[in-house]
A protein has these predicted regions:
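Phosphate/adenylate-binding glycine loop and adjacent helical scaffold
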Residues: 2-164, 170, 180, 191, ...
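Regular secondary-structure segments
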Residues: 158-166, 253-260
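Short, hydrophobic/amphipathic alpha-helical patches that form generic packing surfaces
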Residues: 163, 182, 194-204, 257, ...
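Acidic-glycine-rich active-site phosphate/pyrophosphate-binding loop
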Residues: 165-175, 259-267
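A contiguous, surface-oriented mixed alpha/beta subdomain in the mid-to-C-terminal portion of proteins
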Residues: 169-243
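Glycine/small-residue-rich hydrophobic helix-like segments
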Residues: 229-262, 270
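Acidic, carboxylate-rich catalytic segments that either coordinate divalent cations
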Residues: 251-296
Length: 296
């Protein structure tokens, strides 16, 4: 719908309402935030903004994908209009998101956080059964994790990372983390995706132990290093930082809520959805999650 109250250059302002969105509280600033296009793909655009001293990425996606943290989901026609803006669109964030002459209304943010899991319906027997289903699903899948194809030392390092994070050994955790991050190909390397799976599983285990409030402090050293060093791709950096803040993709959140008993849907359909993510990103996350859950 055109908005006759304003223009951008020679273009009338065009307002759209997204299907869904997730923006963490840090995006709600008093001052206007300006951003620039970082990368564009067939169904995804990534924009970089500075929030304080930290570079943050906002992702705009076409319908059909699962919502990600710090992202906006648009209808197909609206996303196609966004793609026509050229190579260097200007992004602005205030009480709406504006990309050149397109204004995207802000909705109530959808939940992508696992910091406050409901455990009212948790049953240990059900959890153990579902944990085994994840393990068997990975073992039986024709689509394999790229992480499994990395040299053996990365599996040893991932196991060391899990041991360190469970024991709250900050220095050992960081040493193992540095040996893992960035390993693999693509925008989100396999080791990075596996780390995200580990963190989701760790937050679940802390929740089951009534210790979820310690998560941010324990993984804080990882977040601090991600914010100050260029350790991996900017796209992967976004999702690792979100995970350190307790935020994950809606698909991964749903899987964790099925494990916790909060969601009563069957586990197989969501495993299939996660398997489809990226070249092997979904399987890499499941691999990391399984590694964490198999430790009991």
């Amino acid at each position: 719908m055109e908005d006759k109250r304003g223009t951008y250059g020679n273009e009338a302002m065009y307002e759209i309402t997204p299907l869904e969105m997730n923006l963490s509280s840090e995006w709600k600033q008093k001052e206007v935030l300006w951003g620039e296009l970082h990368s564009q793909f067939e169904s995804v655009q990534n924009y970089l903004f500075m929030i304080g001293d930290e570079e943050r990425m906002l992702t705009i996606m076409c319908e059909g994908a699962a919502l990600l943290p710090d992202s906006i989901l648009l209808r197909y026609a609206d996303y196609e209009n966004l793609k026509k803006l050229g190579e260097f669109p200007t992004a602005k964030l205030e009480d709406y998101i504006q990309i050149n002459h397109i204004k995207i209304a802000q909705l109530k943010t959808s939940n992508c956080s696992l910091l406050e899991l409901s455990l009212d319906k948790y049953r240990r027997k059900d959890f153990e059964q579902k944990r085994k289903q994840i393990h068997d699903f990975i073992a039986g899948s024709e689509r394999k994790s790229d992480f499994e194809r990395l040299p053996e030392r990365y599996k040893i390092n991932l196991n060391g990372f899990i041991e360190a994070i469970e024991g709250s050994y900050s220095e050992r955790m960081l040493v193992s983390f540095y040996k893992l991050i960035g390993a693999g190909r693509g925008l989100t390397p396999a080791a990075d995706d596996a780390i995200i799976g580990v963190l989701a599983g760790y937050l679940l285990k802390l929740s089951l132990e009534k210790k979820a409030d310690t998560y941010l402090e324990i993984v804080g050293p990882i977040l601090a290093n991600l914010c100050k060093e260029k350790l991996t791709t900017k796209v992967s950096l976004k999702y690792l930082k979100c995970a350190c803040r307790g935020a994950f993709s809606q698909n991964l959140c749903k899987l964790i809520r099925i494990l916790s008993g909060e969601c009563k849907e069957g586990i197989r359909p969501i495993l299939e959805e996660i398997r489809k993510v990226g070249h092997s990103s979904g399987m890499d996350m499941l691999y990391g999650l399984d590694m964490m859950l198999q430790r009991g």
